[in-house]
């Protein structure tokens, strides 16, 4: 993703600036502008849009927002159909969603390049940018597991969560879920794909903020 950002900025041939590997320390607001103070310098802008992703809550607090909710990361693993099996999916295939769960469920997505993605599952990740199954951050884990909203989410979805973890480490169980929609799929039809991490905004009661958290 970072490489694509660099390529896009260079292709625009504009006055854009791209600064990587900098930590935001705080924000200063004046009548004329907003200053972003990082560990490498200060940047000033008339208008500022912060797209924080998995760090959105931490950046909001650094900007003085009294945010009770907390971002907790959930990793989603994907499989891909092999080239020989792509003919089995002609369009998007989704399961009927369960409104009791904050996740959509495993589905099939035809990509623009012809690839067919199958997934994702949804498992708690021990690192906010934990795209690997064994990625770990002490800070992120402590931050999530000392928040009561995390435990309330866990306990209210215990069986769902256990099944998701089992599927994360078992290709056979993942395939079994896919076969509910396409029974003819076999182990040879799927191969490991990418993974992503969802920034789930959790309230203290374990409820998820599915859309926007707006503060005036």
Feature locations, PLM:
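C-terminal catalytic lobe of FAD-dependent flavoproteins
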Residues: 139, 144-216
